[in-house]
Design a protein with these regions (language model features):
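Nucleotide-activated donor-binding/catalytic signature segment of Leloir-type glycosyltransferases, i.e.
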Residues: 227-246
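Short hydrophobic beta-strand element within catalytic cores of glycosyltransferases
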Residues: 283-287
Length: 356
């Protein structure tokens, strides 16, 4: 079987990370996979085809030719119009090809206005044209059904492939977080309003009795919001306590040097970085946004949770975690076991069950 993983754009975001991880997962199971895209900021690895084109009609033709040239048997693509493009290209190729559309984010963050009936209906049609729709979390699947985007029969949940290394038998560890001189905090993701770095800055403006460094790791998606975050840093006198790393690929390595991961997102689907933190045994504090964080942390069993936009709640969670060795080490020692849900082999098996 030859599987194409199609995304209109490859950048440093979470969906692109899914594309690369999915290809890596299939290759580890000796399944031929090809990435195809029409725009790329960066390209990592082999078996990647860049077809530079902005016209949707031409994209269909170019993708059809790609299918025939590479002898593709199935396509995994994203939500929105990519599913329709993939299905039309598959039909024109003359091959019986299954197309799977993967939903990575809740529909109200797809960029539609309330009155944008035409594009909403086109997105629904695109999902309907695909053979199957995959949601990356159970919460997201339920929302897609409830809001009428897809039927219950059409959609299933498959967690993203995040963990590729073997998870060894765990040995209990102990870190004296109460007496650590400086707490290194990882905040990973695009700098944009949905990731809510502003809430994190406001929360840590209230922390006076512990030394810490906020490590913002990720590219700038919204320049105006980035300026707002920097103004908040100055307003809260945090200039010497914040480090901007920019986009990075070595997240596992970075997490190993951190003490805590914090996510204050206003909306997610299945935040990969939280799974990476679990594998690296880094305790997590997260907002309760829709969807994904509560599911990953099992409603607080594997990390602390605060309400979206509640910077007072975030500062309270931080103080609770770093001033309680028992709590901190409980989360640390539960983390890797939880990360087993998100291994590459489980994802591959689930996708093959749909495709075969």
């Amino acid at each position: 079987m030859a599987i194409a993983i199609y995304s209109n754009v490859l950048d440093n975001g979470g969906i692109s990370k899914f594309v690369y991880n999915m290809q890596n997962a299939f290759q580890k199971e000796n399944i031929r996979s090809e990435i195809v895209t029409f725009s790329a900021d960066t390209i990592y690895g082999d078996n990647i085809t860049l077809l530079k084109c902005t016209n949707h009609g031409k994209r269909i033709i170019m993708l059809k030719n790609f299918i025939k040239e590479k002898n593709i048997d199935a396509i995994i693509t994203n939500t929105w119009f990519e599913g329709a493009i993939a299905k039309l290209a598959a039909i024109l190729s003359g091959k019986k090809i299954k197309v799977i559309s993967v939903v990575h984010i809740r529909p109200n963050l797809w960029g539609f206005s309330k009155n944008d009936i035409l594009r909403k209906n086109m997105a629904k049609l695109s999902l309907k044209m695909c053979n199957k729709v995959v949601a990356v979390s159970n919460e997201l699947k339920e929302a897609m059904i409830k809001e009428g985007w897809v039927s219950e029969k059409k959609i299933t949940t498959i967690y993203n492939p995040v963990i590729f290394n073997k998870i060894k038998n765990h040995k209990n560890k102990f870190i004296d977080i109460e007496n650590k001189n400086n707490i290194d905090i990882a905040v990973i993701g695009w700098i944009q309003p949905r990731k809510a770095q502003d809430i994190i800055v406001k929360a840590f403006g209230q922390i006076k009795d512990r030394s810490f460094t906020l490590n913002f790791i990720g590219g700038i998606e919204d320049e105006a919001f980035n300026s707002e975050v920097k103004m908040l840093i100055e307003k809260n006198n945090l200039q010497g306590k914040v480090k901007f790393w920019g986009p990075r690929k070595d997240i596992f390595k970075i997490l190993k040097d951190m003490d805590i991961l914090i996510s204050a997102s206003r909306g997610e689907a299945l935040p990969t970085v939280m799974i990476e933190a679990l594998y690296c045994e880094r305790p997590i504090i997260s907002s309760d946004c829709d969807y994904g964080p509560k599911e990953i942390l099992d409603n607080g069993k594997y990390g602390l949770i605060f309400k979206v936009n509640d910077y007072n709640g975030l500062s309270k969670c931080f103080n609770e975690m770093v001033n309680n060795n028992e709590l901190y080490n409980k989360f640390l020692n539960l983390s890797q076991e939880r990360s087993k849900l998100f291994t590459y082999d489980k994802a591959v098996k689930s996708y093959l069950e749909i495709l075969e």
